[in-house]
Regions:
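Conserved phosphate-binding/catalytic region of the ribokinase-like
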Residues: 1-5, 32, 202-298
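Glycine-rich phosphate/adenosyl-contacting loop at the front of the ribokinase-like
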Residues: 1-63, 68-72, 79, 244
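Ribokinase/PfkB-type carbohydrate-kinase core domain
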Residues: 1-13, 76-89, 102-235
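Short, basic and Ser/Thr-rich N-terminal targeting/leader segments
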Residues: 3, 54, 93-96, 222
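Nucleotide phosphate-binding site architecture
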Residues: 16, 195, 289
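Residues at secondary-structure transition points
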Residues: 31-42, 46, 68, 93-94, ...
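Rossmann-fold NAD(P)-dependent oxidoreductase module
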Residues: 50, 76, 257, 261
């Protein structure tokens, strides 16, 4: 039987407060804010929006508060076409926020206030909902929802798992992540995250993740493109050239392109190309979702 969803995301739901600045100030320095804007965000959330714009069927597992930010997050998902039945709304607490400072070169600094994101428990996850997908895409969350993710991948033995560890999970180390990694169809770290996780460069680090049980590893290398491997295939995939305006959400966009390739049964190299293409569109505009392409642009 065909799954109801192509991808269900599981991660933080945040309102991003984006500050365009002259430069990102270091300790003891000052810098000027050029403009301020708000938009919905969260790593896995950005990825499922990228996928739904490519005409994939997506849903989400997460938590928001019954406040203005929470309602905006749900409304934006529904407007995009992301199913929200797996999202828990609670009366107490605040929805998550991220303050992002982006300079003229497109580089950024992030300050995260997770709030109710970090209170999601396994008991609040709808197992039937989560099991109706081909891929379950995980992004980093705090300890309580992390434990929920570990239990969930154990329960859903027939669902393919993808993981973007982010720096939060990379800092946990391989031992703590192994229960998830061994269930992963693909792990999608950045070069820096892979180094943090394994202590090795991207080629050697990818081999370690494969030994830990990952089916494939796709390493995001920024301006160098990406490296994809399943142990038998090994590909360096060059980037698409574009003018960088804002790197916020670039990795999330890349994940969307790569997962779309997997859904469409493309080979690893083509999946890497799709990841690079979607990321190139994202970084050409301000914000994590503004530049995410439609299917007709592929």
């Amino acid at each position: 039987m065909k799954s109801k969803f192509d991808v269900v995301g599981f991660g933080a739901l945040n309102m991003d407060k984006l500050y365009r600045v002259e430069r990102i100030a270091r300790e003891g320095e000052e810098s000027f804010i050029l403009s301020v804007s708000e938009s919905p965000g969260g790593s896995a959330a950005n990825t499922v929006v990228g996928l739904v714009r490519l005409c994939a069927k997506t849903g989400f597992i997460g938590k928001v508060a019954n406040d203005a930010e929470g309602q905006l997050l749900l409304d934006d998902f529904r407007r995009e076409g992301v199913n929200t039945d797996g999202i828990v709304m609670v009366r107490k607490g605040r929805s998550g926020t991220v303050s992002a400072f982006v300079d003229k070169k497109g580089e950024r600094a992030l300050y995260v206030h997770p709030s109710v994101n970090d209170t999601l428990s396994f008991e609040e996850v709808n197992l039937e909902y989560a099991g109706q997908t081909e891929f379950l895409h995980l992004a980093s969350v705090d300890e309580k929802p992390f434990q929920a993710q570990k239990k969930l991948v154990e329960e859903l033995s027939k669902v393919k798992v993808s993981l973007d560890p982010g720096e939060i999970y990379a800092q946990k180390g391989l031992v703590k992540l192994k229960p998830i990694i061994k269930r992963c169809f693909v792990v999608m770290p950045s070069e820096n995250e892979l180094k943090m996780l394994t202590g090795k460069n991207w080629k050697e680090g990818a081999k370690i993740l494969l030994k830990e049980g990952a089916g494939a590893v796709a390493v995001k290398l920024g301006a160098k493109g990406c490296y994809v491997t399943d142990g038998s295939q090994n590909h360096m995939v060059p980037p698409y050239r574009t003018r960088v305006i804002d790197t916020t959400g670039a990795g999330d966009a890349w994940n969307a392109g790569f997962l779309y390739g997997l859904i469409k049964k493309k080979d690893l190299y083509e999946c890497g190309q799709l990841g690079n293409f979607v990321a190139s569109k994202c970084i050409a505009k301000v914000g994590a979702r503004t530049g995410l392409p439609q299917a007709r642009e592929l």
